[in-house]
């Protein structure tokens, strides 16, 4: 059963990544990067919160929103996301998780609601903590590893110098897609961003 947002409750936009400077430029931290960009756009400051996430209360597309970056490692993201959702009384239908996606080419953004975790430990942790997979995802394409490189190593490496030149546009598209999801809903946002690459 598909759940659609109702009323005027807040949105929770949770970007996934690993905390600390060691991981800051990693592909796996694309979700953090998008949330940081949204905070910058709205003049918001992420602050430590008892949910074990850095959070900022703000407005996106005219709606109340909470930006969050879990302070746990990726595979334990579910606890902080569930705690923030509970604290701010956010419906599952208003939860947007922003994460890196291996199976999408670098530079592309894809949106969906629900589905499997596709081997992504952060999504697996969130689905387990929430008891549902029926939340919105903004999937930031990082592409597949070259040759026989282990995907686990690939996601924990920094973007290449070539990718870094194109990264700002990718992050802009991902941040824009979050705002369009909130303003217009899933299908219009998919139609817009799935056509770009």
UniProtKB/Swiss-Prot annotation:
| Pfam families in the record | Pept_tRNA_hydro
- Molecular function as annotated in GO: peptidyl-tRNA hydrolase activity; tRNA binding
Task: Enumerate the residues marked as the site Discriminates between blocked and unblocked aminoacyl-tRNA.
Answer: 18
User: Main location per UniProt?
Assistant: cytoplasm
Entries under PROSITE patterns matching the protein: PEPT_TRNA_HYDROL_1, PEPT_TRNA_HYDROL_2
Q: Note the Gene3D superfamilies from the entry.
A: Peptidyl-tRNA hydrolase (3.40.50.1470)
Keywords, in A-Z order: Cytoplasm, Hydrolase, RNA-binding, tRNA-binding
Domain of life, per UniProt, equals Bacteria
Under the heading NCBIfam families, the entry gives: pth
- State what protein this is by name: Peptidyl-tRNA hydrolase
